[in-house]
Amino acid sequence: MIIAVDGPAASGKGTLAAGLARHFRLPHLDTGLLYRAVGLAVKDHVGAQDFELRAIAAARKLDAGHLTAGEELTTAGAGVLASQVAVIAEVREAMRQYQRDFAHQPGGAVLDGRDIGTVICPDADVKLFIKADSAARAERRARQLESRGVAVDRAALHAQILERDARDRGNPNGAFYPAPDAHLLDTTQLDIEAALRAAVAIVDEVNARKAKP
């Protein structure tokens, strides 16, 4: 069973995807970590003449071990590096193939990202699109950062999320455009336990419907 979980920044999709993976005993891939892992692999070569070639090679050699680098993957620096390698077409293609291979392993998987149900796995068995209003998403991200000891400017963080939302709206395959057959789940007023219960119920309903003769 392949479960695709999409949504905008800080919508809770990653936490929900991890919970679904535990519940259904499936492997989980946070696709947002992929470009960060590639960026970190070539961080000592930024600005070098062969930077793009090194990034392409790193993307093609990426394996699960690169996604266990701990908190370094979630730092702002890793985010900057991710943006530098994400503009390379060959890196993007390697990342798409990595995600498809992960999804289609025996037994399936849960993947969360921004275009899983539309671009990566249009054949997913269950597609969830997680949304929440921007204020709720900003507050969640602020609490997440504060839990790591990071000082947060909430107004600036909210502005950043609104800016990213605006960019996403300009991309027809981006995080604001769910697959036509995706199930929408608004988590604005839900805590993680309630959101996970709702997501599990959606998956169970889809599976039950498919099981009917």
Q: What name fits each language-model region?
A:
Residues 3-5:
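Hydrophobic anchor at the beta1->P-loop junction of P-loop NTPases
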Residues 21-31:
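Post-Walker A helix-loop "phosphate-sensing" segment adjacent to the P-loop in P-loop NTPases
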Residues 34-108, 118, 135-139, 143, ...:
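ATP-dependent small-molecule kinase phosphotransfer cores
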Residues 198-209:
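C-terminal alpha-helix
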